[in-house]
Amino acid sequence: MLKKDNNIKFIITADDDIMYPRRWAQGLIQTTKKHGSVSCYRGHNLTYAEGSYNYNQSINQNKFSVEPSFDLLPTGCSGICYLRKSINKLVNDRRFLNFAYDADDIWYKAMTLSAGFKCVRVEPRNIHFPLIITCLSNALYSKNVWQNENDKKLI
């Protein structure tokens, strides 16, 4: 789609098992415009220690702020807004299926880092919008966080 329409300025990602508030997209776009960064309502500052990343440790050591950072990993459950130019052309490379087929947040982070873009929260603290209850059993969250699958993708 990006190849076909040069008028697209922003790409917003969302989960289909979350209920978003009315002005949700507006907050993302305004923050992205203000900082020239990828914006999110929820993200974690990556912790690197002993030669690898620890996603679960990162969750517990968030630096809550609204300052853009290369360390912030946006998590898509509450929505992410990307500037069109922040998405590296490799985002369409199908090799990601070999490394992170079910960890799209990590793949998008790698693509925006390689394009030189920081990430920023819309609000100082993470916001997790309400889940649609019928979707809980198959959520990627269950697999990626509770089964430590995100750690494996970050390595």
Summary of predicted features, one role per range:
Residues K89, D93-I155:
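C-terminal catalytic/acceptor-binding lobe
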Residues M1-K9, W107-Y108:
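A conserved donor-nucleotide-binding helix/loop in the catalytic core
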Residues F10, L28-Q30, K118:
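Residues in and immediately flanking transmembrane alpha helices
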Residues N7-K9, G36, G116:
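Residue-level detector of structured alpha->beta connecting loops
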Residues L2-D5, M19-F96:
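Conserved catalytic core of nucleotide-sugar-dependent glycosyltransferases
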Residues I8-M19:
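Short beta-strand-to-loop acidic/aromatic patch adjacent to the donor-nucleotide binding site
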